[in-house]
UniProtKB/Swiss-Prot annotation:
<feature type="topological domain" description="Cytoplasmic">
    <location>
        <begin position="918"/>
        <end position="930"/>
    </location>
</feature>
<dbReference type="InterPro" id="IPR006068">
    <property type="entry name" value="ATPase_P-typ_cation-transptr_C"/>
</dbReference>
<feature type="binding site">
    <location>
        <position position="304"/>
    </location>
    <ligand>
        <name>Ca(2+) 2</name>
    </ligand>
</feature>
<keyword id="KW-0703">Sarcoplasmic reticulum</keyword>
<feature type="binding site">
    <location>
        <position position="309"/>
    </location>
    <ligand>
        <name>Ca(2+) 2</name>
    </ligand>
</feature>
<dbReference type="Pfam" id="PF00702">
    <property type="entry name" value="Hydrolase"/>
</dbReference>
<dbReference type="GO" id="GO:0016887">
    <property type="term" value="F:ATP hydrolysis activity"/>
</dbReference>
<feature type="transmembrane region" description="Helical; Name=10">
    <location>
        <begin position="965"/>
        <end position="985"/>
    </location>
</feature>
<feature type="topological domain" description="Cytoplasmic">
    <location>
        <begin position="1"/>
        <end position="48"/>
    </location>
</feature>
<dbReference type="GO" id="GO:0005783">
    <property type="term" value="C:endoplasmic reticulum"/>
</dbReference>
<dbReference type="InterPro" id="IPR018303">
    <property type="entry name" value="ATPase_P-typ_P_site"/>
</dbReference>
<feature type="topological domain" description="Cytoplasmic">
    <location>
        <begin position="314"/>
        <end position="757"/>
    </location>
</feature>
<feature type="transmembrane region" description="Helical; Name=5">
    <location>
        <begin position="758"/>
        <end position="777"/>
    </location>
</feature>
<dbReference type="InterPro" id="IPR044492">
    <property type="entry name" value="P_typ_ATPase_HD_dom"/>
</dbReference>
<feature type="topological domain" description="Cytoplasmic">
    <location>
        <begin position="111"/>
        <end position="253"/>
    </location>
</feature>
<feature type="transmembrane region" description="Helical; Name=3">
    <location>
        <begin position="254"/>
        <end position="273"/>
    </location>
</feature>
<keyword id="KW-0406">Ion transport</keyword>
């Protein structure tokens, strides 16, 4: 039933043909079960394990590697016997890499849809219904409840379906619907129709939402929605329809993979094609087919060389290290790729309550009368510090610190705060923090009384828990609460009837302590307390009080005000009808006004500075809240989202105002706004959608079930540590401390991680380009193999992998939060960066081939061949004067390959040092600024020596130990790479990479 809130009780019952006293008949129940289905959220049909496994191989680079492995395996079957073992190493290693990557991918996918399943925890198991087949109330399984059923709920019950209230049996019924609407205090419900068909969930005061909890009271209602037709069911539908989007890094790596695959294909075909003339060379036994296969193997080796197999592992390791650093800053990352996405966040959409504020209501101002002479009067206006539930704070009057015990009226005010109250504060030892037990507003009054300590209780030597209840304990020795007249909507107040336990300044008789909305309480006040005396309260004095509370409730503070009063001679309990709440108004009469307290959910101390940092970093902060517009704007001024005098026209919208705009106007509003108030979940999702259409990268915070679709849709969903399991499951990140400034720290960490990733990607790619150039040169020039596939895999995975991982520990640049966020569509490799890759890569390839050629031609320990002999080595077996005296086996001597491999490894270690910074010289950023890098370089060299000097490994990798002369030559070929990169960095600093300045568009 749509718009059930706008229908009267009778209309709602008639819609389903429900008897308001006896419920549905069995026939009606069966009909409705067939029509509407079971009252449950359907189980998500996940992908099978084999579907997930196959998806992991749906990637171009992976397909190329898989093809290379299959071809290598087939070719290995035709190898000569002595080479069979080494031939199988290459395809085996490639397959192991692919399997490891697939396992990680499947594991991540398996966790992806847990958010939808987490919604199940909000489904109640049982419900209490009234049906015509049995008399009285019967318990049934919640999934058997149908639209039209009469359901009864009471304190502690979980609402089993969306219910339109028809009757309230208690004074009031309060519902904790924070999981659905984000409201921090429980909501008082009623049975009246709400005529607005477009009312948001917060305003549907006659609807009990499925999955929410009854905080107080007892009521009956008719079910208007079950299963997917409930508010929580609609959220489930929205979440299941939300498509997962790839992170900017994943998109860039996909693009990079496509480009690389095209380049690989062209080079492989080119290498094979340019050697067609050598297919019949004597080295292949004069067989054209054997020659074709030989060069096909070289093409496969080229593919293996070009793909950075170690890149996925290094990226995963770097992101995992980033998550550990973020965890220390209270940001728990659930999705690894989102770590990098944080670095390009351009908009943070933040919830107000609990994220920008403490979510701990706190009294900041209060007033009492100083003097009253006729209509001439003056007030004492106090201010209090402290913004949490821990009762620590100072009392100020006119900027001067004062003691509450010096003001008699404050003793009475503190007494009203404690006695007219059903809440408390509790010390949570695990969290080492104070928490509310009951209503936030009442808890603020308890904390106020403790801060005031108006009766000067000695708190010295008390532990934190005892210190926090000392003033309450003192007041409760003076008064005993007999009963409470609960809050009701008609009078907007509550009161407690108390009797004295011992004599006090307030007299010896019973009192009725009252608190409530200022207008309602003042209407029933006849007198006012001034010190210890009591004076008549004229209409002029009432107007002055209301004018002051009006100021408190608007402007910068927008405080929630409560008036406190006392009935000095209350009506006797025996003359009260406590069973009829409509008569409570008659008992709260002849009141004496005591004072007004103004409270707010105060901003967190660190938020203002965090927003200043966001502005400096070019990040827009949009506050999205369920609060009313005036309160939200006041908080935004306090935290720096708006300046004190800034006109918010066109920058602040309520949910209703936003809905009234055309689509074009809505997009324009999202482009410039900084505040959306009184919003619903679909507003959040729509805002994210529009931001994504503008190529903005948005981080969205939330804590309730209602926030889950937007959290899932945003590039970065950020759930609160105190939030619901659904929100946490849908989010990429969880804030352990619910603190906005932790988001800013995480963004800074994300930027640093991206910079480091660029460095190690550059490092690995230049290495791969070097390997490709090496193989291309040997094939194009007709030289013997300088590097074989198993060596390339060793370099790509192990030797290069360790320094690449260590580059993830590079310290962040000092000006990292003074630059604008990078654009999501910014290429991973710019034109200038590509030129640098090619320049370094070409040198790596040339030096590697040059080292092998040096051993053949110029080494004192080598064969002393001519360049012509070397480039025509495949003709050696055919005889001829050109190869007279040359042993043709020398062309497959492992020494030349060892020289090439050693130069490649050494250059890569020096190149790792070059990658400490994109543009900073090694003079200004020396290697020891990252000790992890020095350690990894040492380990890589050690591993290289192991494969050279351990016989079994040297056989597998076809290498051999080098002499001192050969090592000196290796260094001569390697060191120039540092000079080349320093030159390129100098050019970049002066010309190519001038950073953009941050422009504050908002």
């Amino acid at each position: 039933m749509e718009d059930g809130h706008s229908k009267t009780v009778e209309q709602s019952l008639n819609f389903f043909g429900t008897d308001g006293e006896r419920g549905l008949t069995l026939d009606q129940i069966k009909t409705n079960q067939a029509k509407y289905g079971p009252n449950e959220l359907p189980t998500e049909e996940g992908k099978s394990i084999w579907q997930l496994v196959l998806e992991q191989f749906d990637d171009l680079l992976v397909k190329i590697l898989l093809l290379a492995a299959i071809i290598s395996f087939v070719l290995a079957l035709f190898e000569e016997h002595e080479e069979t073992f080494t031939a199988f190493v290459e395809p085996l290693v490639i397959l192991l890499i692919l399997i490891a990557n697939a396992v990680v991918g499947v594991w991540q996918e398996r966790n992806a849809e847990s958010a939808i399943e987490a919604l199940k925890e909000y489904e109640p198991e049982m419900g209490k219904v009234i049906r015509q087949d049995k008399s009285g109330i019967q318990k049934v399984r919640a999934k058997e409840i149908v639209p039209g059923d009469l359901v009864e709920v009471s304190v502690g019950d979980k609402i089993p379906a969306d219910i339109r209230l028809t009757h309230i049996y208690s004074t009031t019924i309060r519902i904790d619907q924070s999981i659905l609407t984000g409201e921090s205090v429980s909501v008082i419900k009623h049975t009246d129709a709400i005529p607005d068909p477009r009312a948001v969930n917060q305003d549907k005061k006659n609807i009990l939402f499925s999955g929410t909890n009854v905080a107080a009271g007892k009521a009956r209602g008719v079910v208007i929605g079950t299963g997917l037709s409930t508010a929580i069911g609609k959220i489930r539908t929205e979440m299941s329809e939300t498509e997962e989007i790839k992170t900017p890094l994943q998109q860039k790596l996909d693009e990079f993979g496509e480009q690389l695959s095209k380049v690989i294909s062209v080079i492989c075909v080119a290498v094979w094609a340019i050697n067609i003339g050598h297919f019949n060379d004597p080295a292949h036994g004069g067989s054209w087919i054997k020659g074709a296969i030989y060069y096909f193997k070289i093409a496969v080796a080229l593919a293996v060389a070009a793909i950075p197999e170690g890149l996925p592992a290094v990226i995963t390791t770097c992101l995992a290290l980033g998550t550990r650093r973020m965890a220390k800053k209270n940001a728990i990352v659930r999705s690894l790729p989102s770590v990098e996405t944080l670095g390009c966040t351009s908009v943070i959409c933040s919830d107000k309550t609990g994220t920008l504020t403490t979510n701990q209501m706190s009294v900041s101002r209060m007033l009492i009368f100083e003097k009253v002479e006729g209509n001439d009067s003056s007030f004492l206006e106090f201010e209090l510090t402290g913004s949490t539930y821990e009762p620590i704070g100072e009392l100020f009057l006119g900027g001067q610190r004062v003691k509450a015990s010096d003001y008699e009226a404050l003793q009475e005010l503190a007494t009203v705060c404690i006695m007219c109250n059903d809440s408390a504060i509790d010390y949570n030892e695990f969290k080492a923090a104070f928490e509310k037990v009951g209503e936030a507003t009442e808890t603020a009054l308890i904390v106020l009384a403790e801060k005031l300590n108006a009766f000067s209780v000695n708190k010295s030597g008390l532990d934190r828990r005892s210190n926090a209840i000392a003033a309450r304990g003192e007041i409760e020795t003076k008064w005993k609460k007999e009963f409470t007249l609960e809050f009701s909507r008609d009078r907007k107040s509550m009161s407690s009837y108390c009797t004295p336990l011992k004599a006090s300044r307030l007299g010896t008789g019973p009192k009725l302590f009252v608190k409530g909305a200022p207008e309602g309480v003042l209407d029933r006040c006849t007198h006012a307390r001034v010190g210890t005396s009591k004076v008549p309260l004229t209409s002029a004095l009432k107007a002055k009080i209301l004018a002051l509370t009006g100021q408190y409730g608007t402007g910068r503070d927008t405080l929630r005000c409560l008036a406190l009063a006392v009935a000095d001679s209350p009506i006797r309990p025996e003359d009260m009808d406590l069973g009829d709440s409509t008569k409570f108004y008659q008992y709260e009469v002849n009141l004496t006004f005591v004072g007004v307290v103004g409270m707010l959910d105060p901003p967190r101390k660190e938020v203002f500075d965090a927003i200043v940092r966001c502005r400096a970093a070019g990040i827009r902060v949009i506050v999205i809240t369920g609060d009313n517009k005036a309160t939200a704007e006041a908080i935004c001024r306090r935290i720096g989202v708006f300046t004190e005098e800034e006109d918010t026209t066109g920058k602040s919208y309520s949910g209703r105002e936003f809905d009234d705009l055309s689509i074009a106007e809505q997009k324009a509003a999202v482009a410039r706004s900084r505040l959306f108030s009184r919003v619903e979940p679909q507003h959040k999702s729509k805002i994210v959608e529009y931001l994504q259409g503008m190529n903005e990268i948005s981080a969205m915070t939330g804590d309730g079930v209602n926030d889950a679709p937007a959290l899932k849709k945003a590039e970065i969903g950020i759930a609160m540590g105190s939030g619901t399991a659904v929100a946490k499951s849908a989010a990429e990140m969880v804030l352990a401390d619910d603190n906005f400034s932790s988001i800013v720290s995480a963004v800074e960490e994300g930027r640093a991680i991206y910079n480091n990733m660029k460095q190690f990607i550059r490092y690995l790619i230049s290495s791969n380009i070097g390997e490709v150039v090496s193989i291309f040169l040997t094939a194009a020039l007709g030289l013997p193999e300088a590097l074989i596939p198993v060596q390339l895999l060793w370099v790509n995975l192990v030797t290069d992998g360790l320094p690449a991982t260590a580059l993830g520990f590079n310290p962040p640049d000092l000006d990292i939060m003074d630059k604008p966020p990078r654009k999501a569509d910014e290429g991973l490799i710019s034109g200038w960066l590509f030129f640098r890759y090619m320049a370094i890569g070409f040198y790596v390839g040339a030096a590697t081939v040059g080292a092998a050629a040096w051993w053949f031609i110029a080494s004192s320990e080598g064969p002393g061949l001519t360049y012509w002999q070397l480039t025509h080595h495949l003709s050696c077996l055919g005889g001829g004067d050109e190869f007279k005296g040359v042993d043709c086996k020398i062309f497959s001597d492992p020494k030349a390959m060892t020289m090439a491999l050693s130069v490649l490894v050494t250059i890569e270690m020096l190149n790792a040092m070059n990658s400490l910074s994109e543009n900073q010289s090694l003079i200004s950023m020396p290697p020891w600024c990252n000790l992890w890098l020095i350690g990894s370089m040492a380990l890589s060299f050690t591993l290289h020596f192991v494969i050279l000097y351990v016989d079994v490994l040297s056989t597998v990798f076809q290498v051999t130990p080098l002499s001192a002369e050969e090592w000196i030559t290796v260094m001569k070929f390697s060191i120039p790479v540092v000079l080349l990169d320093e030159t390129l960095k100098f050019v970049a600093r002066k010309i190519a990479d001038v950073p953009d300045a941050v422009v504050d568009k908002w």
